[in-house]
Amino acid sequence: MGTGNHDEDGYLGYFCKAGDGVVDVQLIADLHKSEVFKVGAVLGVPDSILTSPPSADLWEGQTDEDELGVTYDFVELYTGWFLKLDKKEQEDWLHSLDEENRKEWDHCATICETVHRRNAHKLNGPKNLNVL
């Protein structure tokens, strides 16, 4: 049973290859991180879990957002809204931002795109020679 959601696994590829991304069933793959927390609340997941920062627990004090350099709220806005706009709508919206907000948007979007490209290989299955 997998734990990857749309933001982590589906777009950013933020999982361990041949690790937590290798599962038979991925029930929450189409949910954004915020939706996973909402489902958890409905299911009665303890608040101590729902309010703790997302972490792969790779080292003491590690959090996903610190490691990524961008919040999951931004990733959700970027993948769940911005990338679904057509090019003209994207450009119009970006031009509506003041200089400070545009710089922040560009910085966070660049991080998302960089992580997405860097981890794209994780979204492909292993190569096979097909010699038999």
Where are these regions (language model features)?
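ATP/NTP-dependent adenylation/nucleotidyl-transfer catalytic domains that generate, transfer
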Residues: M1-L132
